[in-house]
């Protein structure tokens, strides 16, 4: 996808239950050295806490992607159509610590103001 429309969080009208629970998402971040890593997640949520819009996902401390998120001020949650299900499955089963797993998928890394995501995403949420 080469064109994106910016949507205010309060205007986001997609089913979070479907997106996260059924279609899955990629959690993607860049570390201080500029390397990008991603992981697949099928858990999380979106809502409002104390007047702030939030997106929530839980990442185990031993996950390689958590190191990237901890080093970054921003990360993305991105969603894909079903044709990328095998890619998301692969990205969720292999560690970027052991190999360049992104290179073994059909996904094309890109960024918005230095915040990484993939061109093929149908929805990208930039989180801070």
Region annotations inferred by a language model:
Residues 1-128:
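Active-site-proximal mixed secondary-structure blocks
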């Amino acid at each position: 996808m080469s064109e994106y429309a910016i949507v205010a969080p309060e205007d986001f009208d997609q089913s979070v239950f479907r997106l996260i629970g059924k279609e899955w998402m990629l959690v993607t971040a860049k570390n201080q050295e500029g390397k990008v890593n991603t992981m697949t997640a099928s858990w999380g949520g979106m809502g409002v806490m104390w007047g702030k819009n939030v997106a929530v996902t839980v990442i185990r401390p031993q996950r390689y992607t958590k190191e990237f998120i901890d080093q970054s001020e921003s990360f993305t949650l991105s969603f894909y159509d079903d044709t990328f299900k095998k890619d998301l499955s692969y990205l969720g089963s292999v560690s970027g610590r052991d190999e360049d797993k992104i290179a073994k998928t059909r996904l094309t890394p890109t960024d918005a103001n230095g915040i990484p995501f993939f061109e093929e995403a149908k929805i990208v949420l930039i989180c801070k």
